[in-house]
């Protein structure tokens, strides 16, 4: 499937690698032509509305303020590797600021997701891997008439995410705290038009969830 066909598909399922690929592709189009020589109205609009990062929405300020607060928090947190629903649960200790640096999507990537949801007016969004909820907040604010269902396997991380939802006063988000392999089969009856994979990053798990949901 070409990237244009993918962007036109009614259901979009992507991970951070694909977000980078889309961004690179649109930048390439802009560099080799310039946006005024692009004949496809859709591609022109995508470059104008998705790639153009000069427009900063008011919701970005609140989300990035929460990020800045998280980056200052040095409290330890015990993490459990529950993403794939593994029976052999691995535990590790980190801190909230390190978790924010390592697991959260960078602002520029999360803002591309925001612009995609806003541009295509997606209304039923599924996020696999809530983490600290910053990317979720971007998805939520992109279309406040829509609904974001987000899954987080780790109970302590899920608790932190819920606090951030409350801080940002997000009303259109449903947070589910369950291992992915347990909950995703229960969600198959729902019709999602935008799916973001940002949880278990193993190839096998990602492909399994992709084929289940798409």
Residue ranges, per PLM feature:
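A short alpha-helical cap/connector motif
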Residues: 2-194, 200-214
């Amino acid at each position: 499937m070409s990237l244009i066909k993918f962007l036109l598909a009614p259901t979009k399922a992507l991970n951070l690698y694909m977000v980078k690929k889309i961004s690179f592709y649109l930048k390439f189009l802009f560099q080799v032509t310039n946006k005024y020589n692009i004949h496809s109205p859709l591609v022109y609009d995508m470059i104008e509305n998705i790639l153009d990062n000069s427009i900063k929405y008011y919701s970005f300020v609140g989300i990035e303020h929460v990020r800045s607060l998280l980056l200052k928090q040095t409290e330890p947190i015990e993490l459990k590797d529950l993403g794939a629903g593994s029976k052999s649960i691995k535990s590790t200790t980190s801190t909230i600021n390190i978790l924010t640096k390592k697991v959260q999507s960078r602002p520029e990537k999360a803002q591309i997701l925001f612009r995609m949801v806003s541009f295509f007016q997606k209304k039923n969004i599924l996020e696999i891997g809530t983490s600290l909820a910053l990317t979720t907040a971007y998805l939520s604010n992109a279309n406040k008439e829509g609904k974001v269902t987000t899954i987080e396997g780790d109970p302590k991380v899920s608790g932190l995410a819920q606090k951030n939802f409350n801080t940002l006063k997000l009303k259109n988000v449903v947070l589910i705290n369950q291992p992915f392999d347990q909950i995703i089969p229960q969600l198959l009856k729902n019709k999602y038009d935008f799916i973001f994979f940002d949880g278990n990053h193993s190839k096998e798990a990602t492909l399994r969830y992709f084929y289940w949901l798409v």
